[in-house]
């Protein structure tokens, strides 16, 4: 069972429909016990970083997500949800994030239209489980005005928008997509299927303990 975190700022409906399409068992929840009982977690998000962190704090979900991140349970952040995984953001004000990944969220300063909205090429950097069946230089769908300034060793996918945008990051059980896999057609569905596979593998490992 995959828990989609509902904290009032997520693209819940599209993520829910995508998981339904790939046949993944899921629950939309903000209940701490349901999140801990899940086999994997998706943190979606659309909106401002400081507001999102305030809401997560109010719902006591910061601690929950940090505990999930520090375990081996698979965690996938999408768009703003990916940004929240980092140490802090410069959006509106300096604001601390979940600190599950090293790096700072900075505003895009490019000679192009902001937000970066639409399809862009994603170049793979290295290999991870979520790349299975995903061709290099596939096109994915973005909507964002901020990007992650982070170490190269956690970057597994890059798009060019006047600056190198980390499109996909990963460290251990933690994954983050700056783009929207649920809106990225067959490529996005394949990545979500791969995440489902990672979740199932983790679940099987727990049953054997």
UniProtKB/Swiss-Prot annotation:
<feature type="active site">
    <location>
        <position position="182"/>
    </location>
</feature>
<dbReference type="GO" id="GO:0005737">
    <property type="term" value="C:cytoplasm"/>
</dbReference>
<protein>
    <recommendedName>
        <fullName>Imidazole glycerol phosphate synthase subunit HisH</fullName>
        <ecNumber>4.3.2.10</ecNumber>
        <ecNumber>3.5.1.2</ecNumber>
    </recommendedName>
</protein>
<keyword id="KW-0028">Amino-acid biosynthesis</keyword>
<dbReference type="Pfam" id="PF00117">
    <property type="entry name" value="GATase"/>
</dbReference>
<keyword id="KW-0315">Glutamine amidotransferase</keyword>
<dbReference type="GO" id="GO:0004359">
    <property type="term" value="F:glutaminase activity"/>
</dbReference>
<dbReference type="InterPro" id="IPR017926">
    <property type="entry name" value="GATASE"/>
</dbReference>
<dbReference type="GO" id="GO:0016829">
    <property type="term" value="F:lyase activity"/>
</dbReference>
<feature type="domain" description="Glutamine amidotransferase type-1">
    <location>
        <begin position="1"/>
        <end position="205"/>
    </location>
</feature>
<dbReference type="GO" id="GO:0000105">
    <property type="term" value="P:L-histidine biosynthetic process"/>
</dbReference>
<feature type="active site" description="Nucleophile">
    <location>
        <position position="79"/>
    </location>
</feature>
<dbReference type="InterPro" id="IPR010139">
    <property type="entry name" value="Imidazole-glycPsynth_HisH"/>
</dbReference>
<comment type="function">
    <text>IGPS catalyzes the conversion of PRFAR and glutamine to IGP, AICAR and glutamate. The HisH subunit catalyzes the hydrolysis of glutamine to glutamate and ammonia as part of the synthesis of IGP and AICAR. The resulting ammonia molecule is channeled to the active site of HisF.</text>
</comment>
<feature type="active site">
    <location>
        <position position="180"/>
    </location>
</feature>
<dbReference type="InterPro" id="IPR029062">
    <property type="entry name" value="Class_I_gatase-like"/>
</dbReference>
<keyword id="KW-0456">Lyase</keyword>
<comment type="pathway">
    <text>Amino-acid biosynthesis; L-histidine biosynthesis; L-histidine from 5-phospho-alpha-D-ribose 1-diphosphate: step 5/9.</text>
</comment>
<keyword id="KW-0368">Histidine biosynthesis</keyword>
<keyword id="KW-0963">Cytoplasm</keyword>
<comment type="subunit">
    <text>Heterodimer of HisH and HisF.</text>
</comment>
<keyword id="KW-0378">Hydrolase</keyword>
<dbReference type="GO" id="GO:0000107">
    <property type="term" value="F:imidazoleglycerol-phosphate synthase activity"/>
</dbReference>
């Amino acid at each position: 069972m995959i828990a989609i975190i509902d904290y009032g700022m997520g693209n819940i409906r599209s993520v829910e429909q995508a998981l339904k399409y790939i046949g993944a068992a899921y629950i939309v929840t903000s209940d701490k016990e349901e999140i801990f009982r899940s086999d994997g977690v998706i943190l979606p998000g659309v909106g401002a970083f400081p507001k999102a962190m305030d809401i997560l704090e109010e719902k006591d979900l910061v601690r929950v997500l940090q505990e999930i991140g520090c375990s081996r349970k698979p965690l996938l952040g999408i768009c703003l949800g990916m940004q929240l995984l980092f140490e802090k953001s410069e959006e509106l004000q300096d604001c601390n994030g979940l600190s599950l990944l090293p790096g700072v969220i900075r505003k895009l300063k490019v000679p192009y239209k902001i937000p970066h909205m639409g399809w862009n090429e994603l170049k793979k950097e290295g290999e991870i489980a979520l790349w299975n069946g995903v061709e290099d230089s596939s096109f994915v769908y973005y909507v964002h005005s901020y990007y992650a300034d982070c170490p190269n060793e956690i970057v597994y996918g890059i798009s060019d928008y006047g600056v190198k945008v980390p499109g996909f990051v990963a460290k251990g059980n933690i994954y983050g997509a700056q783009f929207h896999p649920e809106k990225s057609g067959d490529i996005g569905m394949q990545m979500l299927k791969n995440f489902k596979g990672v979740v199932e593998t983790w679940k099987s490992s727990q049953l054997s303990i």
